Amino acid sequence: MDYSIATLLSYFVDDKLVAGKFLEKKLGCESPEAIEALQIALDALEKMGVLVKERGKYNRVTREDVVEARLRCSSKGFCFAIQDDEDATDIYVREGNLSNAWNGDRVLVKVIKDGTRRKSPEEQVHLILDRANPSLLAQVKKSEDNYRAVPLDDRLLFELELQDKEQNLGEAVDHLVHVSVLRYPIAQHPPLGEVTKVLGSDAEAAADTDIVSCKHDLPLGWTPEAIEALQSLPKVIEPGELKKRTWITAKLQLVTFGDGPRGETLPWQEVALSLESQANQWQVGIHITDIAHYIAEDSLLDQLARKRGTTVYLEEQICPLFPEGLIGRCSLIPDEDRLALSFFLTVDDRGEVTGFEYHSSVVKVDHQLDFSEVQTALADIESVSGELKPYGGLLQELFFQICPLIKSQRLQRGSFNLQTETASPRLDEGRLGVIMTQETLPIRSLLAELMVVLQREVALQLQALGIPGLYCGQVAPEGEDLTDIVKLAGNLDLGVKIDLEGDIIPQHYHHLSQGFESLPAKAVLNHLLANTLKIEKYFSHPAPHFALAYDSGYTHCVSPAQRYGDLVIQRLLKLVLTEGRDRRTKQMKTGVELNAHTCRNQISWNVLPPNLQETIEGDLHQLVLGLNDREQTAEDAEKDLLGLKKAEKMKARAGEIFRGLITGVQSYGFFVQIFDLLAEGLVHVSSLKDDWYEFRSRQCALVGRKSRTSYRLGNEVDVQVRSVDYYRQQIDLGAVNNAPKDSANMDFDDDDEDGDEREEQDTMDWDAMEDGDDDEGGAVIF
């Protein structure tokens, strides 16, 4: 099993000694060669002062002059070490101190020279923990005696030698290729790579999904060993397993929801719902397929899923967490017995959850419902007929009463919604952490309300049991993240006041999104607001969740076939049922119900055996960092594909004129978000030939000296598509001469104290642009 230094070091937690044998087991070192390689790594880390050996075991050394961070480099070679702590200062690392580290690598950075009043401390990459670029996109070129690959990512300032074994690289010269890194640079030896796929003559000739999957190193296929492991899984449910579980098939209607043509069985049906009306309350059943039963911990399929972390959606192409063959065994399809974990929420007539319990179960789904079909039926619930008629009561109570009540509770707590035109593949709040509503399909977001409140209850149950958990949180945005959109809201006279020096709270987003509702540009504004949110992160402890307005205690559990973290939670919940102690001592006649809310505040003992609890804590600590990295990669890849799609559409419409909203103004030009496609481009100041334009930072505007014509944040303008850089997703726009003359409404007199400095800075920026600094040469599409 391959592993990084970061993975190895993640097993050193809480200043505890770790035996070499323990690491061999955890890292899958079975052969003599693998054990020897591990020992070499341990010896090297000991010599570097990262580990210390005590009584035959190892411990991690904590040093104040060494910090862990991820490298972020620019195309000019400037590199900063970005620490995981949001409040930590970024560390500048000179090019000569990178120690062969590349952009994106996780590293240990060490202070090699203390700072003075005039100079910052000098830092050096002490150790590369994890490589971020196991493969890359490049262009092949022929040198005197071999072939080389030039990375397309201009932040990777090197060339790779190409291995020319049984490959006709001459045919690939000047073509876009996917290169697998065989050897990273070491001493005088340059990096070595191997061409694994020729994508096309250039980026535009290649398939966009190929570009994205190769760029982000997404695994699309499965090894023969993985397929063999899949085939060895049981194809039928063992009779003994059925006897251990609660049957949820006789008394309740079970339905699943999905997107697809009527009558078509949809893959990966992970969740089924049931509903039972009671006096002044409901019992809502949420039944989740039991992936944990089939995927044993540390099995080959589990290791591969852990490495993938999450399913990545590239439109029709999906990079799944598990092989497709698992669908037939686990998916909750109609009229088939399936193993599940069944959760029951008691919801009162105010939308508050008053009861929670869960069971290992067997379920049989009665019917699969299509979102669009249900939305149409709910518009005229009295006339529901055909196959939907038996479920009319369930749908009416679920979407007209229960989910709206739960939503009301969430909004009263301080949470908010944002509108979107595209549906998320997730049933819950998704990676951005906010419930997105669709005007055409509002039941999707209503169903998400139910998933969110279930996941909150699961987190509360884990905390009440005192067992380790994998929690989901979201960091609040910084004031500077909202600067432009708050100024934009002010220019649009929305009347929303936000103190950017203070804490940003969810109510700020609620007020902004509510203010956008009445504006023609609301789609653009909601899109911009969503882009200010940080994606969710995993934690090994309860953490606040910004968009959902939870102080602490939230997790994910409804998608164990699509997110590895959900599978981990499923295993923990099942472990409670099989290994949990429901009473302090065996002498006690009665115990608590560990699977129900009634045990909360009743437990004063260790529910799990201490050794097991300690092992789980260590595993979760090791897991968190990897899962967060994979979620970020998935988010980047999905955004990348969307950006390529938009760039392709805009390139095909070069020369056309579009209406858009000015969303940012700088000294070098202004950014325009085009209404039709939500694509953003840059109108460079050099393209404004009718006047000399000056940047006014206070008004967020570019103002013509003679004409007083202004391009101001929040103005609507017509722009023409001049050119598009497809791979970099940069759109160059030109302004059509229809900008408003705002001199009557705004004070554009040259009375700023920093006027001369501003004008000089404008000139400097422009000079830098002409000298070839293309960092501002176009807008990256978000």
UniProtKB/Swiss-Prot annotation:
Gene3D superfamilies recorded: Nucleic acid-binding proteins
CDD domains registered for this protein in UniProt: S1_RNase_R (cd04471)
Residues covered by region (Disordered): 737-782
Any GO MF annotation of the entry: exonuclease activity
Domain RNB, residue spans: 270-579
InterPro entries associated with the record: CSD, CSD2, NA-bd_OB-fold, RNase_B_OB_dom, RNase_II/R, RNase_II/R_CS, RNR_Ribonuclease, S1_domain
Biased composition (Acidic residues): 747-782
Entry function: Not known; control resistance to the carbonic anhydrase inhibitor acetazolamide.
Family: Belongs to the RNR ribonuclease family.
Protein name, UniProt field: Acetazolamide conferring resistance protein zam
Classification of source organism: Bacteria, Bacillati, Cyanobacteriota, Cyanophyceae, Synechococcales
